[in-house]
């Protein structure tokens, strides 16, 4: 396999400024992709752009986007087409966890928090798909970020789990709609991945799980995953090595659900 399998491929990413999105941007740049990066954190995007351009000599554009707002998402994708002339793939990785995760059940659910979490995670993914599929090249590929919580229930995690379940349904629906164009749409379902979002969630409840501790989840590999490991899966699904995979929800959880 070529060390630059994404040469001349244009890939759009949300959630690019941190965590899985950041590592995915780095990996794709190292493999020759031309990138259109979106995130709400504009300063971090600019820092990443400078790093990728200097280290990998690839074309990168960045856009501050609130994925809850379709107008902003559509403007970003239009900017991508204006700059690069096409869109070969996208990874919709923007996501948030609720501050009340692990603390409040459904009876105590705050409606503003519910709307925010579903807005970023689920509506944000729908907005991204809506804009991307209008211009996606035939035989393109899209990866959406679900979660292990999109496959299983979890007490005191209603908004996040509901959003991530919804992303799987949205992914399957999109795959059925655009398969005739050769466009593939898949969802990844990460487990415990060492990211800023995981740290923030654990800080909010004052609980820091360590491998080997009594309350650590039953993960077969006995450790948290790294964001760069998830990036490898995203890159695989965007690549020509996965041309018969579509409508799938693929776990990357170290053997948590097995």
UniProtKB/Swiss-Prot annotation:
Induction: Constitutively expressed at a low level.
Keyword Protein transport attached: no
Disrupted gene: phenotype observed: Reduces the production of abscisic acid (ABA) and accumulates a compound that corresponds probably to 1',4'-trans-diol-ABA.
Pathway as given in its UniProt record: Hormone biosynthesis
Keyword Disulfide bond tagged: no
InterPro entries per UniProt: NAD(P)-bd_dom_sf (IPR036291), Sc_DH/Rdtase_CS (IPR020904), SDR_fam (IPR002347)
EC number: 1.1.1.-
MF-aspect GO terms: oxidoreductase activity
Pfam families linked: adh_short_C2
Protein family membership: Belongs to the short-chain dehydrogenases/reductases (SDR) family.
Name assigned to this protein: Short-chain dehydrogenase/reductase aba4
Designated gene of the protein: aba4
